[in-house]
């Protein structure tokens, strides 16, 4: 079905499919947008009045993008920050749903921030750090620089990317 610019567009498409009685296409629409096929069934059965709320549509888009990118580790935490912002702010949900806003670009901004703000890890920490190398536990060797943004910076970068703040 392609990319939707808003939850309203998504719900209008769902409304058309419901009016045609096309439950199978409605289920496909739901799954393509990170929702469950059961959400489509609930919509057709009249249990809910729309296929997706603003939060469901935004979280669904992020879920689909996250899966495609194989998001894991610290980037999973960064992704979760977007969902948390959506839960707190309907305008943020709308911004996430916009065409041209993508999780990969937000992640790229966080990685750029991480690189630009890296700091050396203390030698005191490194000399007691063990790492697996070739299947063997060894002392960490060499300098290490980290620049992982704190939670406040992650939120700030998310708001700047998605909302332009």
Show the residue positions of the predicted features:
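Low-complexity, interaction-prone regions
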Residues: 1-79, 163-165
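Sequence-level detector for tyrosine residue identity
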Residues: 43, 102, 106, 113, ...
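Short amphipathic alpha-helical patches
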Residues: 37, 106, 133-134
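Short, compositionally biased low-complexity segments
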Residues: 47-57, 80-83, 124-135
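Phenylalanine-focused residue identity feature
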Residues: 1-4, 92, 115, 140
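Long, highly charged low-complexity segments enriched in Glu/Asp and Lys/Arg with interspersed Ser/Thr
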Residues: 117-165
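Charged, amphipathic alpha-helical linker/scaffold segments
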Residues: 57-116, 120
């Amino acid at each position: 079905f392609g990319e939707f610019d808003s939850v309203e567009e998504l719900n209008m498409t769902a409304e058309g499919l419901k009016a045609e009685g096309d439950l199978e296409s409605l289920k496909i629409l739901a799954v393509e947008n990170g929702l469950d096929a059961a959400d489509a069934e609930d919509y057709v059965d009249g249990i809910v009045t729309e296929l997706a709320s603003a939060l469901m549509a935004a979280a669904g888009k992020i879920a689909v993008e996250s899966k495609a990118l194989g998001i894991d580790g610290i980037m999973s935490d960064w992704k979760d920050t977007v969902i948390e912002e959506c839960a707190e702010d309907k305008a943020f949900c709308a911004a996430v749903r916009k065409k041209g806003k993508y999780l990969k670009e937000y992640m790229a901004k966080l990685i750029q921030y991480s690189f630009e703000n890296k700091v050396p890890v203390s030698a005191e920490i490194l000399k007691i750090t063990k790492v697996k190398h070739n299947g063997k536990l060894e002392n960490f060797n060499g300098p290490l620089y980290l620049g992982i943004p704190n939670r406040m910076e992650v939120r700030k970068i998310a708001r700047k990317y998605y909302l332009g703040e």
